[in-house]
């Protein structure tokens, strides 16, 4: 088995938000992800990079058990959130996903109003007891998603009527309305134009003050701009993980250097 390489910096246990040990994923007989060991830090943006099909999105979905929804998918090894095994039989995946929110590649607002898109999670999780409390949560989430000023006069309008970039910010507001501890983002800018992408990247930088953010991206430039730590996946393995500056300027594994320089991918 190939070694997993880490940066020199020693990370204390209380900085670690999510930890994976020997994480493996199977789709039926296909061994899609092998022996991933990684510590994801609190209030940090971590980027997952690598060629298409390398396992980065598969691993991202492990972190809030979205792979549970895929027939024939099996996850082995151990993944913890604040030290608790998220695959323990006593863990409710729905409650886990309130703590570990997710934003997908393509904006997917519910066929509801802007207001109801954001209010949906707090309602089903019982996070508010009154209309006033729901109003406060909705406004707060839209403000943190940098959408309040554009949406405050049209909260009853369909979320699907927003532009692509606005829809993605609405999906971010929806994800953070349940006060998660971690926000997973699977190529959140791939369907957006450069202006909307820049807005989302600025938002990601602001969100890390409150959340751990994990982003899958095919854009190495984006990973370099928004993340503090980067993990490079290749052929179902985590090849190298460390501080973003080190990964991009002084990678330790030749496969990482080959990918960053464009020789593989």
UniProtKB/Swiss-Prot annotation:
InterPro entries: AAA+_ATPase (IPR003593), ABC_transporter-like_ATP-bd (IPR003439), ABC_transporter-like_CS (IPR017871), P-loop_NTPase (IPR027417), PstB-like (IPR005670). GO terms for cellular component: plasma membrane. PROSITE patterns: ABC_TRANSPORTER_1, ABC_TRANSPORTER_2, PSTB. SMART domains: AAA (SM00382). Its main location: membrane. Its EC number is 7.3.2.1. ATP binds at residues 50-57. It comes from the Bacteria. The keyword Nucleotide-binding applies. It is an enzyme of class 7 (translocase). SUPFAM superfamilies: P-loop containing nucleoside triphosphate hydrolases (SSF52540). It is a peripheral membrane protein. Keywords: ATP-binding, Cell inner membrane, Cell membrane, Membrane, Nucleotide-binding, Phosphate transport, Translocase, Transport. The complex is composed of two ATP-binding proteins (PstB), two transmembrane proteins (PstC and PstA) and a solute-binding protein (PstS). Part of the ABC transporter complex PstSACB involved in phosphate import. Responsible for energy coupling to the transport system. This is Phosphate import ATP-binding protein PstB. The gene is pstB.
């Amino acid at each position: 088995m190939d070694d997993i390489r880490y940066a020199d910096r020693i990370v204390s246990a209380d900085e670690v938000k999510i930890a994976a040990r020997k994480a493996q994923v199977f789709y039926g007989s296909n061994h899609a992800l092998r022996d991933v060991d990684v510590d994801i830090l609190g209030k940090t943006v971590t980027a997952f990079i690598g060629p298409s099909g390398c396992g980065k999105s598969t691993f991202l979905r492990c972190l809030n058990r979205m792979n549970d929804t895929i027939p024939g998918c099996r996850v082995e090894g151990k993944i913890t959130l604040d030290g608790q095994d998220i695959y323990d039989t006593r863990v409710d995946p729905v409650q886990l996903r309130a703590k570990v929110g997710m934003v997908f590649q393509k904006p997917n607002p519910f066929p509801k109003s802007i207001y109801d898109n954001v209010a949906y999670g707090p309602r089903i999780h019982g996070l508010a007891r009154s209309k006033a409390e729901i109003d406060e949560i909705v406004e707060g989430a839209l403000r943190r998603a940098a959408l309040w000023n554009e949406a405050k006069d049209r909260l009853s309008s369909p979320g699907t009527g927003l532009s692509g970039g606005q829809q993605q910010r609405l999906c971010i507001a929806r994800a953070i309305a349940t006060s998660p501890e971690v926000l997973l983002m699977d190529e959140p800018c791939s369907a957006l134009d450069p202006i909307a992408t820049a807005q989302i990247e600025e938002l990601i930088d602001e969100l890390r003050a409150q959340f751990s953010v994990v982003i899958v991206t095919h854009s190495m430039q984006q990973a370099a701009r928004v993340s503090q730590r980067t993990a490079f996946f290749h052929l179902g393995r985590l090849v190298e993980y460390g501080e973003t500056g080190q990964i991009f300027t002084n990678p330790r594994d030749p496969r990482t250097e080959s990918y960053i320089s464009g020789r593989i991918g």
